[in-house]
Amino acid sequence: MSRSWIVAAFVFITVGAFAQDYQFITCGPGYNKQSYVNIKEGTEKLVNNDAWDLAFTAFSFQDAGIFINESSGSTQGQNLPLTELYDARVTNFTDNIILDSITNSRFLNSEKSWTYGAFNESRVISDPYDFGWGKYVPSAQRVNGNKIYVLKLRNGQYKKIMIESLIGTTYTFKYANLDGSNEVVKTINKMPVSPTKLIYFSMTTNDIVDVTPSRGYDLIYGRYISLAKDPNGTIEQQYNVTGILTGPGTKAVAAKGVNTMTVSHLDYENSYSAQTDIIGYDWKALVGTSWSIANDRAYFVKTVENRVWKIVIKDFEGSATGNAVFEKTDLGISSL
């Protein structure tokens, strides 16, 4: 990447009624961090990939989403270990778990929204009371856990885990070694709920972890697992990719095959989606030994405050630094 154009890029530019600026983001050498990006403030908070393992939604009194941390760095082209979740294929927490029987029952986060995570992937979609890890009981106004999982941690250790309940605003869950030793029971209270709130938990510290910036964030830049084609472009399978996800409460729409200087957000104002990977990872491609950026693609991002930004990604340096740069244009508050 040419440093000279970056210096020039950070000069504040006014085009018509809108202001353009450039924002530098990074997920570190070897993609070893997650970046929580605030577009308006032009800031980011960096968190180590292994800072947390589970994330519980705390958006309202009705949600019960639970995510795993799929972020993993790389070294010499090889992915480092990450948190993995499997169906234990047993009925009771005390049952014997056979690891060889669970290898084909892995659960991943879906990038469809922040409503459901990996722990919710086994739910029956047509049943609004089914949260995957448990079912809502209307008469008791609680979610009762009914599924046992196995977590493979980054250090190679296995833990069995059960989300026992969500009563009111309190999650209760337990985990232990596969032989039942070192059992830990934890509770997490959602309060105060917020439309953008996730509560992060570390299996290493056995406690809640402070991950997100105090002033909020709009984007997450780092690693996650997604369907992607192999380097030859022939086989599509799950890969650990480097990309940008929108945060809870943030929506986005992609404008592809356009002139990024003249494209209007008004043509896309009815197409915003809460799907988290609208920006995703495929705005870049490895050509030989260097990265090429799609120059006919813009993204319109609507933040929690209903402010609309045009995002055009300008540069990506790969695993050597994890650095990227995007151009941002403040388009003001949306009336929709």
Predicted stretch roles:
Residues M1-F24, L336:
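Bacterial Sec-dependent N-terminal signal peptides
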Residues Q20-L336:
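Surface-exposed, beta-sheet-biased, low-hydrophobicity segments with strongly acidic/polar composition
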